[in-house]
């Protein structure tokens, strides 16, 4: 039987629900794909592990924009500190990196120089003479008071009449013959009397009362040379001097022969914070590993723990700085067959260094890979002309220029990628 609805005439017909089209209800927004960083073929790019704390490269890339602007809230300077071992002593590598960056972004001068130096005789980027100082370094085998050390791991005590002179030069690298500002840094518990003589002209006297903070005296002008003489400085510790520009790039070389980077954690926090007030770095580059890697070393757990502590210490004292860790470069040894090979311990250390960068949220550049990887140090040694020494460990100035060029190109490419990503995300 057919079912019949006896009340159908009395019912209101059901209204059909129209299917809404895109004009009546909003569609979900189009999801914008994430910007994908690329790396140019043949280039070893920086691996940025920076997070929301911004200790990767972002802060540095943004700081570079300051060199071409005239914002009243900043001085137009971008400051870079390079901490390392004997691989970069005498301004190897950093001299050419400084020149490349200053040519592009402006700036002049060699930057920070310790009061005395064992490499002053063969550092080509500044003429450095001194006398009358008692020098102390964290790597000394004799007693060293860690509480007194400054940013370079040194402190210097003057005798009456002690002097230090810096003279610009033009034999190696450009933009170093003159600077616009020269400074000296010290900590005095008693009054101090200094004399500054610029360009071998008239002497100018300076007197400062005791202070509990890091002090700085500066002279300005077109400065080709500056000589500081200590007339009286009871209870005063000196740390270094500088030749800088007033705008553009400042790059300071803090090399320390025999260092592994672990001694950075022992520099007093108060001292580093006061240096940060005087020289607020936008980028800190760490170059270590020569004094850590062993021929067959596999386990570097203790080193990883120590360097993580050093990096955290730098983060706390330089809260605005980007931090870039460079891997150890290639280091070769002769096998029993007389063949030159990369130390196995080097490759193991590089894996630890990359983990250190990732765990601390900073940036990492694989210098070993950039050099050419396996056996690349031997290739540099045997190049014509040679770019490294026959210890198959240290580069020379030609090798430094080669590696500086590789890092410079990587930094510029990273900056371009960062700018593209920022523009894309603001569309």
Residue ranges and their predicted role:
Residues 1-24, 414, 419-427:
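Bacterial Sec-dependent N-terminal signal peptides
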Residues 17-82, 136, 149-160:
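Membrane/wall-proximal cationic-aromatic binding patches
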Residues 64, 101, 105, 314, ...:
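Hydrophobic, Leu/Ile/Phe/Ala-enriched alpha-helical segments that form helix-helix packing faces
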Residues 76-82, 89, 93, 248-340, ...:
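Conserved, compact domain cores that house catalytic/ligand-binding motifs in diverse enzymes
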Residues 84, 186-188, 327:
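Short beta-strand/turn micro-motifs composed of small residues
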Residues 89-191, 196-197, 208-305, 394-395:
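Conserved SGNH/GDSL esterase-like catalytic core that processes O-acyl groups on lipids
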Residues 201-207:
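Surface-exposed loop/edge segments in extracytoplasmic proteins
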Residues 268-269, 331-427:
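Catalytic His-Asp segment of secreted/periplasmic serine-dependent ester chemistry enzymes
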């Amino acid at each position: 039987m057919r079912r019949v609805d006896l009340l159908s005439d009395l019912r209101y017909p059901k209204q059909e629900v129209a299917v809404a089209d895109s004009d009546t209800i909003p569609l979900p927004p189009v999801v914008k794909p994430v910007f994908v960083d690329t790396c140019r073929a043949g280039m070893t790019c920086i691996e940025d592990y920076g997070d929301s704390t911004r200790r990767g490269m972002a802060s540095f890339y943004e700081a570079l924009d300051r060199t071409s602007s005239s914002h009243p809230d900043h001085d137009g300077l971008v400051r870079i500190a390079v901490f390392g071992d004997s691989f970069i002593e005498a301004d190897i590598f950093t001299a050419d990196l400084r020149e490349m960056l200053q040519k592009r972004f402006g700036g002049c001068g060699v930057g920070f120089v310790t009061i005395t130096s064992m490499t002053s005789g063969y550092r080509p980027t500044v003429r450095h003479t001194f006398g009358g100082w008692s020098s102390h370094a964290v790597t000394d085998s004799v007693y060293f008071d860690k509480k007194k050390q400054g940013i370079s791991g040194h402190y210097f005590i003057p005798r009456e009449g002690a002097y230090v002179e810096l003279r610009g030069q033009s034999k190696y690298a450009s933009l170093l013959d003159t600077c616009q500002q020269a400074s000296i840094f010290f900590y005095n518990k008693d009054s101090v009397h200094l004399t500054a003589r610029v360009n071998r002209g008239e002497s100018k006297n300076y007197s400062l009362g005791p202070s509990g903070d890091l002090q700085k005296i500066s002279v300005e002008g077109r400065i080709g040379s500056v000589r500081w003489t200590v007339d009286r400085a009871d209870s005063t510790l000196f740390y270094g001097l500088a030749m800088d520009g007033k705008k553009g790039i400042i790059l300071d070389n803090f090399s320390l022969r025999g260092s592994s980077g672990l001694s950075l954690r022992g520099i007093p926090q108060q001292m580093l914070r006061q240096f940060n007030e005087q020289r607020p770095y936008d980028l800190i580059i760490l170059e270590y590993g020569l004094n850590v890697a062993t021929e067959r070393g596999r386990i570097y757990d203790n080193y990883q723990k120590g360097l993580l502590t050093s990096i955290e210490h730098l983060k706390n004292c330089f809260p605005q700085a980007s931090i870039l860790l460079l891997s150890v470069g290639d280091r070769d040894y002769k096998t029993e067959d007389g063949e030159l090979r990369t130390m196995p311990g080097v490759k193991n250390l590089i894996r630890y260094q990359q983990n250190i960068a990732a765990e601390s949220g900073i940036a990492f550049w694989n210098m070993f890979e950039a050099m050419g990887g396996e056996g690349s140090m031997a290739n540099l040694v045997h190049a014509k002309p040679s770019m490294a020494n026959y210890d198959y460990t240290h580069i020379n100035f030609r090798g430094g220029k080669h590696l500086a060029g590789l890092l410079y190109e990587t930094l510029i490419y990273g900056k371009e990628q960062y700018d593209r990503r920022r523009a894309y995300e603001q569309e």
